[in-house]
Amino acid sequence: MARSKFERKKPHVNIGTIGHVDHGKTTLTAAISATLSTLGSTAAKKFDEIDAAPEEKARGITINTAHVEYETDNRHYAHVDCPGHADYVKNMITGAAQMDGAILVVSAADGPMPQTREHILLAKQVGVPTLVVFLNKEDQVDDEELLELVELEGRELLSQYDFPGDDIPFVAGSALLALEAVTKNPAIKQGEDKWVDKIFSLMEAVDTYIPTPERDVDKTFLMAVEDVFSITGRGTVATGRIERGIIKVGDTIEIVGLRETRTTTITGLEMFQKTLEEGLAGDNIGILLRGVQKKDIERGMVLAKPGTITPHTQFEAEVYILTKEEGGRHTPFFPGYRPQFYVRTTDVTGTINQFTADDGTDAEMVMPGDRIKMTAELINAIAIEQGMRFAIREGGRTVGAGVVSKILK
């Protein structure tokens, strides 16, 4: 039989496993991969293939992440799993692997632990919109009441961080026993093994509870300006990569950031030296702007659909500060620290005014390797929105990464 060609007929969703160390995140990833491979559309990935996660760089930070893909009857998934706790923190803050939703893994034998709490907090801060919970190691719990207690504790913890604790699906099972059953019998079908069935139940919950994300092209138009030049007789061209949305010749847009917001009309679009009628999310494109001088627009501004993004100077953010070994600072810093914030395409100087620990108390200083909530104020207003990622730099060297959790001014 000839191999069928891969066609993306199903909606695509990015998810990941989060939770405390040793609660079984990677085993669960392998169990899902193995279980769904029995449906025949994707090959199983083994535990050690996932565990030996390759290094990748995002915003100047090295992160280990494993990427696994699999399909249910309804969807195509890309799943990320990180080997170490620090990798999770860095991945979630840099948005290296975006998550439309996540499976929170909690050991039914131990209940929620410190990193369970930390990952829920992080998911909230960095904008992972939806969680589903897998209570792993159910085989190690003899008492049904204990299982109910762990679930109750989990739901309370989720509600504490503004997730809908009462509505989130909880599925109990054993990733290890499911993985062993499928490994022993790769042709296993739904209904033949209780542990494998629990993985199917989990994925059913993921399929129905985690919404299909809005595609980038369906969002409102935004492009960060990377370069500007003038074409004699035609006007000013701003180039960059379209972050989201669609743009057409004749559309009205706003130029936002660094100066007064102004409105202009698009008179032409170019890509690879050719003119085109519309540009889509992901395109590297040149946009010809009506009545705009080269001196009026610069790198660091954004072009956007009118009324969709505004310039700001003050925000709260969740940040990760690199260790010395990662190429970061060797010494701590204190409130009043003035680094550059690299946002989209440009550096803007700002002051960090305050640090807040996870428990809500003020922190006096920040050490390399810390994750902290901070309040910053930029010297120039730029286009900022909740969930936006940035790097913290000192003289061109990345010393941290962050994500905007709240706009203040």
From Swiss-Prot:
NCBIfam families from the UniProt entry: EF-Tu, PRK00049.1, PRK12735.1, PRK12736.1, small_GTP
GO CC terms, sorted: chloroplast; cytosol
Region annotated G5, chain positions: 174-176
Function: GTP hydrolase that promotes the GTP-dependent binding of aminoacyl-tRNA to the A-site of ribosomes during protein biosynthesis.
InterPro entries the UniProt entry points to: EF-Tu_GTP-bd (IPR041709), EF-Tu_GTPase (IPR050055), EFTu-like_2 (IPR004161), EFTU_2 (IPR033720), G_TR_CS (IPR031157), P-loop_NTPase (IPR027417), Small_GTP-bd (IPR005225), T_Tr_GTP-bd_dom (IPR000795)
Top-level taxonomic group: Eukaryota
Subcellular location(s) of the protein: Plastid, Chloroplast
PROSITE patterns: G_TR_1, G_TR_2
G3: annotated segments: 81-84
Organism: Pyropia yezoensis (Susabi-nori)
Chain residue ranges for the region called G1: 19-26
Location of region: G4: 136-139
Family assignment from sequence similarity: Belongs to the TRAFAC class translation factor GTPase superfamily. Classic translation factor GTPase family. EF-Tu/EF-1A subfamily.
Enzyme class per UniProt: hydrolase
Keyword terms: Chloroplast, Elongation factor, GTP-binding, Hydrolase, Magnesium, Metal-binding, Nucleotide-binding, Plastid, Protein biosynthesis
Residue intervals of the tr-type G domain: 10-214
Entry GO MF terms: GTP binding; GTPase activity; translation elongation factor activity
Catalytically driven reaction(s): GTP + H2O = GDP + phosphate + H(+)
Record-listed GTP binding positions: 19-26, 81-85, 136-139
Annotated Mg(2+) binding sites: T26
Region G2: start-end pairs: 60-64
CDD domains per record: EF_Tu, EFTU_II, EFTU_III
E.C. no: 3.6.5.3
Stated name of the protein: Elongation factor Tu, chloroplastic
Main location per the UniProt record: plastid
